[in-house]
A protein has these predicted regions:
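Cyclophilin-like peptidyl-prolyl cis-trans isomerases
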Residues: 3-243
């Protein structure tokens, strides 16, 4: 299965590291060792195939608001915040985003704020009829959410609670069309993108897995580095390099 990817200039440390590991052949024969459908496919663990810590360093986080977790993006895996508060990236492990397509409401609504406002509203006597509607819909999560969303403007005006998240038009457009994993934004460094062979992600994500979300049959990978003129990349794939 063939994929082509580009690496972002906005994340120079990750780009340099990824190219060096690819050119040296260290990524070759590594596997996708963690696969979760509608989420992501993770691989590149050089230490796993060597049974020792060949890669024992981390890379400082390189967050950029213009780079987010839409489908096909490549991001660095890392240890959790409890042991890695600076969110530094693994020296070799990465994941490719699959995710899912979101509605605009799913994407932009702060559900906790919304339902907190709904609870306050339903305590008021003037909303007794609305409270009854929620009681009647209590066994229908979709109808309950629909009712809650219909009250979002009332809650914002009445209590000054901010219900909608401030997201750029580009982010909303991406997550409501190609999809992705928005809750990872700002927590993991996105440093590249699959630009050809996007369907391969879906094929890998759909394989049978066992304990630890590891595919039952190994899915190995190999890498080749090819330098392409920046103007050609912009023309063919729509990525504009920063000045």
């Amino acid at each position: 299965m063939y994929k082509r990817q580009i690496l972002y200039d906005e994340t120079p440390l990750h780009k340099k590291n990824f190219i060096e590991l690819s050119e040296s052949g260290q990524f070759d024969s590594t596997i996708f060792h963690r696969v979760i459908e509608n989420f992501m496919i993770q691989g590149g663990d050089i230490n796993l195939i060597n049974d020792e810590d060949v890669i024992d360093y981390t890379i400082p986080a390189e967050f950029n608001n213009s780079l987010f977790h839409k489908k096909g993006e490549i991001a660095a895996a890392r240890m959790g915040d409890n042991v890695n508060p600076k969110k530094e990236s693994s020296g070799c492990q990465f994941y490719i985003v699959q995710g899912k397509v979101y509605t605009e409401d799913e994407l932009t609504l702060d559900i906790n704020a919304l339902y907190g406002g709904v609870r306050r509203l339903l305590e008021e006597e003037e909303y007794a009829d609305t409270r009854q509607k929620f009681i009647e819909a209590q066994n229908d999560p979709q109808e309950t959410q629909k009712l809650a969303i219909s009250l979002s403007s009332v809650i914002e005006d009445k209590y000054g609670i901010k219900i909608r998240k401030d997201l750029s038009a580009d982010i909303v457009s991406a997550y409501t069309s190609v999809g992705g994993v928005p809750h990872l934004d700002g927590g993991y460094t996105v440093f590249g993108r699959i630009v050809e062979g996007l369907e391969v992600i879906d094929k890998i994500a759909a394989v049978k897995t066992g304990p630890g979300d590891k595919p039952v049959e190994d899915i190995p990978m190999t890498f080749k580095v090819k330098k392409i003129n920046k103007d050609k990349i912009t023309k063919d794939y729509g990525y504009t390099y920063p000045e």
